[in-house]
């Protein structure tokens, strides 16, 4: 969900979260993120998979978290775990590809397989930081 908040609304998002947390509350933010700094999402992914999404870089989020009064206590970068997850999703998809083709067509199947394989490579080879988990 956080990938659809967008940079323009980060400050509001974190300030609102800070106001809603109990004094001893903990927030866990789970998001796909970038390891190569701020940049727009891939145009193909924007058009075909996640319209309106944005994968943030740490450098974009940390200042907004700090300004909101939240304190970051831990950051986990789980890119290799997510690469494995994507490989498993792709395998499961390929096991049922004929069913998917009957339901959605060959073009969809090729697109989805390409998406899963390219994202797996991106997470495995550090294009994406993937699954940034912030505890605040």
Which residues does each predicted region cover?
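Serine-hydrolase catalytic core recognition
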Residues: 10-13, 29-31, 37
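A short SAM/SAH-binding and catalytic strip from SAM-dependent methyltransferases
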Residues: 1-9
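Structured DNA-binding interfaces in DNA transaction proteins
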Residues: 7, 18, 31
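A short glycine-rich, Lys/Arg-flanked "PGG" loop and its adjoining helix->strand segment in the class I
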Residues: 11-26
């Amino acid at each position: 969900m956080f990938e659809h908040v967008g940079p323009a609304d980060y400050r509001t998002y974190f300030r609102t979260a800070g106001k809603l947390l109990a004094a001893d509350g903990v927030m866990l933010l789970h998001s796909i993120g970038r390891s190569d700094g701020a940049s727009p999402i891939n145009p193909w992914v924007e058009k075909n998979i996640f319209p309106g999404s944005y994968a943030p870089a740490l450098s974009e989020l940390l200042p907004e978290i700090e300004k909101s009064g939240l304190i970051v206590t831990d950051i986990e970068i789980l890119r290799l775990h997510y690469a494995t997850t994507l490989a498993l999703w792709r395998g499961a998809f390929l096991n049922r590809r004929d069913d998917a083709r009957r339901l959605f067509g060959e073009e969809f199947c090729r697109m989805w397989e390409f998406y899963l394989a390219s994202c797996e490579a991106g997470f495995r080879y550090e294009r994406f930081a993937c699954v940034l988990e912030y505890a605040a």
